[in-house]
C-alpha cells in the first residue's frame, strides 16, 4: 500500500507524539509477519482456500466462514484466559492476539484475491 499524501501528516505526528508506541507497533507487525510465514510453510494456502478457486464468490464466502470460525476460536480462548484468570498452557495470550490479527489480514487477502498467489 502506498502512503497517500494526506496520511503523511498523521504518520509523522503519531511517530513524534508516541515514538515508543509507534516503534512497538512496527515490532509487533514484524512478529505477525514472521509467524504468518512460519505457519504458511506448515499449512500452505489450501487450509484457507480448501483447494477451491477463490475468484468464485461462493468459494470466497466459504473461506470467510472458515476464517470466522478460526477467529471465534481465538476470541473464545482469549476470553477464557482473561475473564477466568486461566493459566496459559499451550500458547501465550500474546500468540492468540497475533493469530487473531493475522486471520484478519488473511481475510483481507482473500477479499483482494491475493491469497495463495
Q: How should these model regions be labeled?
A:
Residues 1-117:
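Intrinsically disordered, low-complexity regulatory regions
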